[in-house]
Amino acid sequence: MSWIHVHAEDGADGEIAELYDRLRRERGRVSNILKVHSLRPSALAHHLDLYMGLLFGSGGLSRAQREMIAVVVSRENDCEYCVSHHREALAKYVKDTDLLEQICSNYRQAELSAGDRALLDYAARLTASPAAVAENDVV
């Protein structure tokens, strides 16, 4: 998938093998987006810590909300790989396949709670036009 050389899971050793093992334990597999860091294990470790903190850390957002935000940000960034990656995770929480497809293709047409719509509107705006976000958008 990537143009960047990656270390295969079955041939990995040392620090990268340990990180791949961690990923398989914690996530069940090693995603392609993380394999692209395999030439720099320290970058992979930092990316993994950030990813786990954002999507699985404590806080006021549910896993479904975090994955919806990730899908919307991925769509705004026009990254089909990222949309697909986060859609797969979101499908574990959104069982209505029509709703799932609406969120992934154009969340603005999906029947969402006011709170979820506000989260996604904010994420989309922050991604598309970060300089346009003002203090009153946050508080």
What are these regions (language model features)?
Residues 1-139:
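Hydrophobic alpha-helical segments
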